[in-house]
From Swiss-Prot:
CDD domains: EF4_II (cd03699), EF4_III (cd16260), LepA (cd01890), lepA_C (cd03709)
Reactions this protein catalyses: GTP + H2O = GDP + phosphate + H(+)
Membrane topology: Peripheral membrane protein
Compartments it resides in: Cell inner membrane
Alphabetical UniProt keywords: Cell inner membrane, Cell membrane, GTP-binding, Hydrolase, Membrane, Nucleotide-binding, Protein biosynthesis
Pfam families tied to this protein: EFG_C, GTP_EFTU, GTP_EFTU_D2, LepA_C
Protein EC: 3.6.5.n1
Binding site for GTP: 14-19, 131-134
Family per record: Belongs to the TRAFAC class translation factor GTPase superfamily. Classic translation factor GTPase family. LepA subfamily.
SUPFAM superfamilies assigned to the protein according to its UniProt record, in alphabetical order: EF-G C-terminal domain-like, P-loop containing nucleoside triphosphate hydrolases
GO cellular component: plasma membrane
Official protein name in the record: Elongation factor 4
Record domain tr-type G: where: 2-184
Amino acid sequence: MKNIRNFSIIAHIDHGKSTLSDRFIQVCNGLSEREMKEQVLDSMDIERERGITIKAQSVTLDYTARDGQTYQLNFIDTPGHVDFSYEVSRSLAACEGALLVVDAAQGVEAQTVANCYTAIEQNLEVIPILNKIDLPSAEPDRVAQEIEKIIGIDATGATTCSAKIGIGVEDVLETIVAKVPAPEGDVNAKLQALIIDSWFDNYLGVVSLVRVKNGTIKKGEKFKVMSTGVAYQVDRLGVFTPKMKDLDHLKAGEVGFIVAGIKDIHGAPVGDTLTHAHNPTDKPVPGFKKVQPQVYAGMFTISSDDYPDFREALEKLSLNDASLFFEPEVSQALGFGFRCGFLGMLHMEIIQERLEREYNLDLITSAPTVVYKAIKKDGEIIEVDNLSKLPEPGAIAEIQEPIVRANILVPKDYVGSVITICIEKRGVQVDLNYVGNQVSITYDLPMIEVVSDFFDTLKSVTKGYGSLDYELIRYEPANMVCLDVLINGDKVDALASIVHKDQAKYKGRELVERLKELIPRQMFEVAIQAAIGGTIVARSTVKALRKNVLAKCYGGDVSRKKKLLEKQKEGKKRMKNIGSVEIPQEAFLSVLKK
């Protein structure tokens, strides 16, 4: 056991984490030259296209160090984006050490700081590594100082490397062997194994990635899942090198996969503990905090025939992504679908993209909202993640909205523009610190403002250098109202939203004008209105198409023409009363995308 090293890499998007892991695999001959491709561990197409890591992956490599001993390195890859911080905390729970990889040209970013604190809280040994030192703009000394000032860990003599051209990779591996502590645990004790991740394979059933804390698990043995008490038999177990490599057993300190023919998707929940069926342990391994969805949206299939496939796809995805929440929902405008909870907007986009690609579904998503608290006059508190749960306006004493503490790191040239967008988003400044070239700005912001398009705006005003990390801190009363959209007097539930009263008129006008362009002209007039309760705050009209009924009259008497026009008017009136407006799918999509 003393030769096992479990570690993960903490790094911001684009700081070279996936490339460094490719080099580890090459140096340790994990894959043959023919099988190597860039970003081996980013197995999803979306991960490669967007250049981000979404799912945690694991690799076991054998490395012969300079002291002549062979070490087993269990490396767990982690995502860098703020929406996937839960994946990070899961990966860290299985490690004794973490490499903090920082781009020597760009410096420390906000998410790296947040993930680094998670690692320190879990008592991991954090080792700073400066990557990309081959770049002409690299300033390793400045960045090392930044690491010390912002994060507070000693970065003097930090290992430097360039994963792209392969310099210093062996030094990094030597540093891991020297500094990451060996795992603790007893091979002969009762079995305790923590499930770090599970996913559904169409041939094997549920595949679980586990970290064995104590004891040994062998092929053919029976184990049980502690939260459900159900027992299964091990069909296959082994490690990823990144390919699946079968072994006879996994012992304390190791990280590997277990396949037990579990067909029920919820059979092996992430964060659970496995133990022997015949000689179980009393206490589970302390898992990690259950994560609460922050953003909710309705998802509907464009054709109602896909509904059963949609449900199955969500169930399979939720096994692999423990932070996805869903429940059935019906909308008058969009039909049957699910109300889904996500960690943030990127998470929502990725889930929608995965559903559309991997399961061939055509989906439409309603406007995202966060969880508000409505306090009724009789003191009852209702959590509102869906507008249909909002009580009547007369019964509400106050609405409270979630406030997040946002920590923004930007180069000092952009401070002014960042403060401006924070003020526009109703933010309150908490702190501002200059650290070398970077400025750390802390703001309390309403969560709805952060999840809608704050990240994109921040990136554009800071030319891509700004980074953001946020956490929910409290709820506070806010002047929120429900903005309804009426088309010919009928409410369209899919377009309703909760907005701040000060912005209601502006948002209403914007929405109405946008719909006016998107709804095709009908044979009768279509009135589009935005309303708060009974008050109309904006209105627009799609003019009617009309046939020229006087075309056949040529000359003739004026009273004859009048009669025809009156008749047309009557017909239009009747049509307006009984005609319904077809709103094209594009209109919904365009309005909801904003």
